Amino acid sequence: MKTMASFVLVLVAAFALPAAFASLETKDVITRAAYEKLVESGAIQGITMTKTIISNPILEEALVAHFNRKLGGGTIFDCGESCFLGTCYTKGCSCGEWKLCYGTNSLPESNNEKAMVASLEKDVITRAAYENLVNSGAIQGITMTKTIISNPILEEALVSHFNRKLGGGTIFDCGESCFLGTCYTKGCSCGEWKLCYGENSLAI
């Protein structure tokens, strides 16, 4: 009886645990193909309003490409303080609409209005802070850890970046992971991140 129970336990461990870990690994991850499909359909707002885990290569590629285009080599800096009675005490910094202090070379207020966050919640990355990190080449450091990004910043970067890459093509995520390098949905093939993509998705 003990031998039989042990055998059943081994079988459960062999088959159930890998499946459980696989589901943990892929749950709520938005793939490149899924993002592009959502951008193309105009449904991006739906995913940026909720907590979503984005694979690092997608997030990094979109943010680096988008903000490098906007930077144009200029110096962007976040003064690291909030306004106090409408005043910033760091030299060269001024108070923005969201009670955050920015350097004189930061983006104009008209751009900030769309993307900055009013909240000073811990770990929120503002537009100025992102651009500073992108400019310094340190983007890898923030995409490897849990970071709260304001929805307008994320939406702007992803929509802008992926709309450039889409070119009107049909993008679809096959909704399955590769199994032994194979995808079983017709017209789908295995990509670099062990996820299946349709024929018209971006080249991996």
UniProtKB/Swiss-Prot annotation:
Q: Which UniProt keywords apply?
A: Cytolysis, Disulfide bond, Hemolysis, Knottin, Plant defense, Repeat, Signal
Q: Which Pfam families match?
A: Cyclotide
Q: Which PROSITE patterns is this protein grouped with?
A: CYCLOTIDE_MOEBIUS
Q: Which family does it belong to?
A: Belongs to the cyclotide family.
Q: What does this protein do?
A: Probably participates in a plant defense mechanism. Has a weak hemolytic activity.
Q: Anything else of interest in the record?
A: Tricyclon-A and tricyclon-B are hybrids of the Bracelet and Moebius subfamilies.
Q: What is this protein called in UniProt?
A: Pro-tricyclons
Source organism (scientific name): Viola arvensis
